[in-house]
């Protein structure tokens, strides 16, 4: 049992509630619940197993479910009851939402903003949780680097962009490198190079997009956050989306779009903005789908823009009255990309639109 788990467990046994303990220790209520639960599981473990685990530095019962304990005269096999993985994951996500406090943002920085302008901050293919070895790929990458990169890149974009009244942050799919603890792509089952545990990477992704949203809120009057599905995080993206929606549930300046489906579409004056990860359809079909599904917006606009990611390199084309732009990824190359001679560079952008004139400004931050 870790000292943190023992501390939370002892306070709980003395009659303190989990929320009270969380306030006292300065932690989320979900963190305290998890520590108490792990402590209880440890105390229910056979003492011999506790001792064996302690000897090899595995005090956290959540790490080890079974194994062999070798003694002088025999080898003993033990097996701990294993939680249902699906139920345990859902419980953890639910607890995280419950313990996540709503945020009181500091006041927006003083200064006028232009109601005729809107700025888009796309975050394509960040692959938080990916691990790259610099000697193999040319550049190191892990969870901490990914979060720092998003904070730095978006921060520079916000600082250099016009003071538009509105802003949209679009996590354009593959925000997370892995969808779960299997460390494989959901559809193709390709084995992934993953840094740390999925639980930690999920928390890091929530933190990174929250940091981006709150930096943008210091400049813009209204910030919309969009978290889209990717082929790497087919369902994990929803945990990020719902966590952020809960975080800003009482905030009037940050709105997290919570809609089912894979497409984001927004009208701003004569501008039509759309995005999708880009793994399921080519540009021509995306444009036809846009016109067919949102004919009112199509007919009411003159400047139309479609963002995709997925392939990690830059490509822009005009298709049937729409500027379709495939964006460079935020992530570094992994071993697969390096071995296949992919050489695209990482990049952040901030694109500003005038409600009547279309795109009027673009900031690029190369990594």
What residue spans do the PLM features occupy?
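Acidic, histidine-bearing metal-coordination/catalytic regions of metal-dependent phosphoesterases
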Residues: 2-144, 148-151, 162-163
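Peripheral, non-catalytic segments of secretory and membrane proteins
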Residues: 16, 188, 365-366
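N-terminal short leaders/motifs
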Residues: 58-69, 210-227, 274, 304-309
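Core catalytic region of metal-dependent phosphoesterases/phosphodiesterases
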Residues: 107-108, 113-126, 134, 139-254
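Conserved beta-sheet core of the metallophosphoesterase superfamily
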Residues: 217, 243-255, 259-262, 267-367
């Amino acid at each position: 049992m870790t000292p943190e788990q023992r501390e939370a467990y002892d306070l709980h046994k003395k009659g303190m509630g989990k929320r009270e303990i969380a306030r006292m220790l300065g932690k989320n209520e979900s963190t305290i619940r998890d520590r108490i639960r792990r402590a209880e599981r440890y105390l229910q473990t056979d003492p011999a197993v506790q001792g064996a685990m302690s000897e090899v530095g595995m005090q956290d019962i959540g790490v080890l479910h079974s194994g062999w304990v070798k003694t002088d005269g025999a080898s003993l096999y033990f097996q701990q009851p294993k939680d249902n993985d699906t139920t345990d994951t859902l419980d953890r996500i639910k607890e995280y939402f419950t313990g996540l406090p709503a945020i009181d943002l500091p006041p927006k920085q003083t200064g006028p903003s232009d109601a005729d302008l809107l700025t888009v901050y796309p975050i394509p293919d960040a692959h938080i949780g990916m691990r790259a070895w610099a000697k193999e790929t040319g550049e190191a990458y892990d969870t901490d680097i990914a979060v720092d990169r998003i904070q730095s890149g978006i921060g520079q974009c916000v600082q250099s962009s016009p003071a538009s009244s509105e802003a949209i942050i679009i996590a354009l799919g593959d925000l997370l490198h892995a969808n779960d603890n299997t460390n494989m792509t959901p559809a193709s089952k390709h084995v992934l190079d993953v840094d740390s545990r999925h639980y930690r990477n999920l928390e890091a992704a929530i933190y990174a997009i929250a940091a981006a949203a709150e930096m943008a809120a210091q400049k813009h009057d209204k910030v919309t956050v969009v978290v889209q599905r990717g082929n790497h995080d087919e369902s994990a993206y929803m945990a990020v989306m719902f966590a952020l929606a809960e975080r800003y549930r009482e905030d009037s300046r940050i709105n997290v779009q919570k809609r089912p489906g894979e497409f984001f579409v927004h009208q701003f004056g004569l501008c039509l903005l759309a995005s999708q990860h880009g793994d399921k359809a080519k540009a021509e079909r995306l444009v036809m789908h846009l016109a067919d599904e949102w004919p009112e917006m199509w007919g009411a606009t003159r400047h139309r823009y479609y963002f995709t990611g997925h392939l990690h390199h830059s490509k822009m084309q005009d298709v049937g009255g729409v500027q379709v732009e495939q964006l460079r990824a935020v992530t570094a190359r992994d071993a697969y990309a390096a071995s296949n001679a992919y050489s695209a560079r990482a990049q952040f952008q901030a694109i500003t639109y005038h409600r009547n004139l279309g795109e009027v400004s673009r900031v690029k931050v190369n990594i």
